[in-house]
Amino acid sequence: MCFITFFGYCALELTSSLWASSYLVQARGVSAEVASGCASLFYIGLTLGRAINGFLAMRFNDRFLIRLGLGIIFVGILLVFVPYHAMFAYIGFVIIGLGCAPVYPCIIHMTPDLFGKEKSQAIIGVQIAFAYTGFCTMPPLFGLIANYVSISLLPAFLLVLLVLIIAMHEKLVRLKTNQ
C-alpha cells in the first residue's frame, strides 16, 4: 500500500507539472507563452509549500500533514475542473503544487514509524523505486490519453490518481494503527 501511494503521488506530481501548459493551451485556449509561465507556478506552489511544511512539521505529525496536502491537492484539482475562466486552472495548478509539498517528505519521514527502524531503509528503497516507476510511466500514459481521447481529461486523470493515493494511504494508516 505504501508503494502504491508513492507510485500514485509521484505520478500525480509529474503529470500535473508536465501537462499543465499543454492542457492550458489545448483545453483552455491560453497562449503558449502565458501557459508556460502559469505551468511554472506549480513549482512555485511546491517550493513555497515545502518551506511552509518545514515549519508545520514542528507542530503537526506526518499523517496530519499528508492528509492536509491531499486535501489541498483536491481543492486544486477542483479548480482546474472549473470551465469558466482559465484563471481557475492557473490557481488550481499552484494549489496542486502547494498540496504536493508535504506528501513526499512526510511519507518518507513516517516510514520508520510504520515499519520499524530496522526495516525502514529497505522499505524506503522500494518506495523510491515505485516513485520513479510512477514518474516514468504515468505522464506518458496520460500523453496517450491526451493524444487519442482528449487532453481535457487531465483533471479527471489527476483526480483518479488522488483517489488512489488517499485510499492506499488511509488503508495503510488504518492497518498500522490496528496492529
Which role fits each region the language model picked out?
Residues 7, 40-44, 71, 125-133:
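Transmembrane alpha-helical cores of Major Facilitator Superfamily
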Residues 64-78:
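Structural signature of the two symmetry-related core transmembrane helices
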Residues 1-40, 47:
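Extracytoplasmic gate region of multi-pass secondary transporters
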Residues 102-115:
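Intracellular juxtamembrane helix-capping segments at the cytosolic ends
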